[in-house]
């Protein structure tokens, strides 16, 4: 699998988790409660580790600098926009984690706050993934050489083993499969 295909495949996993988050949000709307704080914590771990450290790490450390080297602008361009959205995602995950903590401390309004931030995160990621899949990644395929992409893939493997940890990727996929069976079937 080449570097860009790896990022596209990771987007599929992210889309599944945001569908699961939508279902959890629907349950919050119906009951005012979080049906499983454990499942929410698992999703937050996925968002922080897989989405941010792994996936965004690959983009920020390798893809974006490579695009800048071939003249794709950071300021006012797609790279800058993606970086800004990555930060917005981090901020929203922090807000969701804070709301979960407040919920666990007995705050009756915290579930709805979590749902509000989850909705914002879902919208952000849906739009972000569309931009990357349909604009940024085609730019990368067009402008980056096969050698650059091959080197990038090796770098991706290093990020995965060093920032995420051996076996963690597979562990996340098992978690997603389990939550998918609970929430989406």
What kind of region is each of these model predictions?
Residues 1-185:
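Small-residue-biased structural context
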